[in-house]
Amino acid sequence: MQDISNHTPMIQQYLKIKSQYQDILLFYRMGDFYELFFDDAKKAAELLDITLTARGKSNGESIPMAGVPYHAAEAYIAKIVKKGLSIAICEQTGDPNTSKGPVERQVTRIITPATVSEEAFLDNNQDSILVSIFEKNNKYYLAYTSYTQGKIYLVKTLTSLNELKNTVLKLSPQEIITNSRELAQQNPFKKPIKALEEWYYSNFEAKKYINDSLDTNIANNILNLYKNDQLTTIGSILSYLTNILKDTPRHITDISYEQEQDTLNIDINSRINLELDNNSKSSLLSIIGKCKTSLGSRLLKRYFSNPTRNLNILATRHSIINSLGENQHFLKIQDVLSYISDIERIISRVALGTVKPKDLVALRYSLEQLPILKKLLSEKNTPEITNINNRIHQLDELVTLLDKAIIENPPTTIRDGGVIKEGFDKELDELKSIKDNSYDFLIKFEELQKQKIGISTLKVGYNRVHGYYIELSKQHADKIPTEYVRRQTLKASERYITEELKNFEDKVLSSKEKALAREKLIYDTLLKKVIEYYKQIQETAASIAEIDVLANFAERAIKLKLSQPKFNNLAKLELKEVRHLAIEHNIDEPFIPNDTLLSKDTNTLQIITGPNMGGKSTYMRQVAQLIFLAYIGSFVPASYADICDIDTIYTRIGASDDISSGRSTFMVEMTETAYILNNASAKSLVIMDEIGRGTSTFDGLALAKACAEKFAQMGAFTLFATHYFELTELAKQYPNVCNIHFEAKEYKDNIYFMHKAVTGAAKKSYGIQVAKLAGISQDVLESAKQNLYNLEKKQQLTESTQVQAQFQLEPTTQNPLQQKLDAIDINTITPLEALNILFELKKR
C-alpha cells in the first residue's frame, strides 16, 4: 500500500478502505452525501454526469471529488449497475459525538450487477443471473444463480470454448465470475466478468460454504450427489455471495442439475437468426409473451432459454392450455393475476434486508388475491391444474398481520418512522401521542406567557438547531421575567427558554427518539415474522408464474389461431398451413401459409429454389419457430402439426464481416457451417440459406453441393435454400432429397410473388425483376438484360460440359499417367522395377 501519512486523517481512512475494493467504486458516506475521490470521482462524474470538484491536496495536486446526495443515491447507483459496474457502500458506523478523529466507517454492502435486489436496479421481466465458470484441465464447470429466485443451477461439464460461449450467452447473465484470468481477459461473452482469487475455487472452501449456507439435509445431499469439481463451482457462488452480502446467503434454498438430454438445444447464432428472444418488436417473444405478472414474464424467458423435450411436461402444459381455453376461462384468471406484484423478489428483499415498507403493502395486497385465484383454478378440476393450485398457499395469517401493522401508503423507508399503523403497538402509540399532543401544550403555554407578562406579540416556536424558544421583540427587554434564560439573539428580537419549556422539550425529543427506536424494533420483528413464510411464498410465486405463462399461452392460442401440436416417434415432421407469426403480425394483407413434410420414409432434405423475396427464408424460419414453440409447451401457428423428436436446431442465415476478429463474410459463413456439419445429427433440424455466396461461382457451388450431400447422408432434417439450380439434380441421386420452389408470375415486365411452396425446381431467379423493385435505374436494368441474354446464349453452347464441370467437380476420365501410377504397388516393387517404370514413363 502507498504511503498515506501526508494525507489528512479522513483521506487516510478513505484510502485504507479503498485499498480493499480497488476494482469497484467506493461510495464513502460523509453527512448527507456519498463522496467519491481520486479516479473513482472522475469515473463517477463521467458516468453520472455530475460535477467534478476537488478537496485537499495529494502530492501537491488537488484531490478529485464528486458526490451524490444520500437520499437520491438509489437512482445514481442504478445507473452505475446497469452499466455493468460494481459499488461498495461505506457507511458511518461510529458516533460523531464520541469519535476522536474521523468517524468510524466500514463497507456495509457491495452492489454488483447480478446481486442487486432493489426494484430500481432490476428489469422486472428478466432474471438477474450470476454465472460462475471453473476452468480445469481444458474443461469448464458452470453453475449459475438467479439471485432473487433463491436457486443455484448446475450445468453439464462443457468441453469447448464454443460450447461454453453458447451456454453463457443463452443465459444472458448480468455478471460472470471465474478462476481463469485468461478467460476474464479475453471475455468472449462481452459481459461483465471478473477473475476471483484462488480461494474462491478451493474445494475445501466450497464444501465449507455449502455446509454453512444451506439447510443441513440439502447440504448433505449436495455433497453426496456431486463430484468435487462440481461442488467447487457451486461453492464459488456461495462464497462470492457471502462476501458481497457480508452475511450468509440463506435465501439460497435449492440446488438443481440441468439435464441437457431433456432440452431442445439452439446455439446463440441460431437464436439471433430466428429472432427468438431479442428486444425487437418482431421477435417471437414479443408476439407470444403477454404475461400479466413479472413472475410469468421471467418464467417464459426461462422456457425460451431451455425448451423441454420431456413429453410428459409438454402434455401437462397442453392439457392446462386446453382447460383454461374452455369458455375463455383464462380471462378471469388473467384479471386476478394483473393485481399480483413480484412477490418472489419482495420476499427475497425481506431475506436480504433490502425490503421497503411499500413492498410489504404490495405483498399483502398480492396475497389478498390468492383466495380468488385459487377459487378460479378449482373450477377447472383437472389433475394438472389441481397440482398447481395445491402449491399456491393462502396465507391468511400473514395478510392479517401486515394489514394491522403497516399503513396503506407508507414512506419510502423506515428511517423517519411513520410506517406502523396506530393501534398495532400500545407503547408506540403512547410515545407518538406525546409528540402529537405537543401542539396543544404549546398553544396553552404561549397564551399563559402572554397573560403573565402582558405582551401580546410573544410567540413560542421551534427550530432544529436551538430547539423550543419564547421569542420577544428587543423593545420589551425591560419586561423579561427572571426565569427566562436567553437562548438566541437575533437582529430585532431575543429568544428565551424556561425550565418548564426545557422539560417539555426534553420529553418531546426523547419521545420522538424512543418512538423511532420502538418503530424500528417493531418493523424488524415484523420482517422476522414475514421471513418465516419464505418457502411458502417462493413456492406460491413459482406456481403463479406457471399459471400466468399457461394462461398467456391459452390467450395467445385463441388470439393468434394456434393449434395443439402432436408428437410422434416415427421420425416424421408433418406441418400444414404453417405461418410466420411476426410477419403475419406486421403486414396488412393476409399471410400465405405453407405445408412442410420431412420424413425418414420420404425426404429429409428439401432443396429450396426460387426468387429473392419469394418466401424461401420465411418458409424455413417459420418451420424452426414452430418447432421451438412446440417444445416450450405453446400451441403452434399451423392447422396441423405432427412433430418427431428434435434435439437441436441449427441455422446458417445471412452473414456480415466480423471486423473485430479480422474475419470476412465468407469466413464467418464457413465457420458457422463447419460448426453445424461437425455437430448435427439425424435428430437435428438444419436451416441453410444460400451457402457459398461469398466466393466464386464454382467454389460456392462445390461447397454447397458437398454440404447438402453431407446432410442428406446423415439424415438430418434439412431445409436448404439456394440459387445454385444445379443442386436440384441431387434429388435424382439421393432418395431422401426433394425439390420445392417458390413461384413468381411475370406480367408486363412486372413480377408478382406467390409466396407458395410448390413441388419441383424453380426455372428462373427473377433477379433483374427484383432489382427493378429495389429501384435500380432503367438503363442499368436494360444493360443487365443484355448481359443475361449473352450469358444464357453462351451457356447453351457449352451447357453439357459446363454443367458437368460445375456439378461433378472432377475429371470425367483419368489421365493415363495417373492410371499407371495408381497401378503401382509400392509395397512389393523392387528398386530395379521402379527404375524400369520410371524409364518407360519418361519415354512417353
UniProtKB/Swiss-Prot annotation:
GO cellular component terms, A-Z: cytosol
Keyword DNA damage recorded: yes
UniProt GO BP: mismatch repair
Keyword DNA repair: yes
Gene Ontology MF: a single term: ATP-dependent DNA damage sensor activity
Gene3D superfamilies registered for this protein in UniProt: 1.10.1420.10, DNA repair protein MutS, domain I (3.40.1170.10), MutS, connector domain (3.30.420.110), P-loop containing nucleotide triphosphate hydrolases (3.40.50.300)
UniProt keyword terms in alphabetical order: ATP-binding, DNA damage, DNA repair, DNA-binding, Nucleotide-binding
Binding site for ATP: 610-617
Pfam families: MutS_I, MutS_II, MutS_III, MutS_IV, MutS_V
Function: This protein is involved in the repair of mismatches in DNA. It is possible that it carries out the mismatch recognition step. This protein has a weak ATPase activity.
HAMAP family, sorted: MutS (MF_00096)
Family: Belongs to the DNA mismatch repair MutS family.
Name the record gives this protein: DNA mismatch repair protein MutS
Organism: Francisella tularensis subsp. holarctica (strain LVS)
Gene: mutS
